[in-house]
Amino acid sequence: MEQTKIPSITFMCRVGDEEPEDGGCAIGGDFVPTTTDQLFGGKKVIVFSLPGAFTPTCSTYQLPGFEQGYEDFKAKGIDEIYVSSVNDSFVMNAWAQHLGIKNVKLIPDGNGELADALGMLADFSVITFGKRSKRFAVVINDGVVEKAFVEPDATDADPDPYGVSSPENVLKSIS
């Protein structure tokens, strides 16, 4: 995956959602087509992807860890950090609001196009998830993958491997 040019993919990102005063779900805002070229061109970014929003490892460790380490990554020359998941923008936005995410930006890869382009789309049908992204992180410099951190495949002994793509591991590899 390293040295792979990210193809031009368009995501439908929902912007303008605000948390409602009555505690209900935020449903306002507009869909804005956003391309990988807009997100990654001319910048050094981290994209990490995971099987699903609101899932245990993703919600307890991975997304909160990248959010907490945001300034450390910025100090090492990273311009932005993105989380991608094969979920729609409503789910992604609700997840970020639920976790209080302010710095990590969301990529709703609802059709799995980014995951597929990177060879990371996997079949999670055995647990009724359908097609989802494997857990990974990449450092992208001006649209090209510089470094890749891909978790090993799940096994009976370790059904949700996590460590290779952790924020701590990614951070220590950036010079």
Segments (PLM) and residue ranges:
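Chalcogenol-based redox active-site neighborhoods
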Residues: 1-175
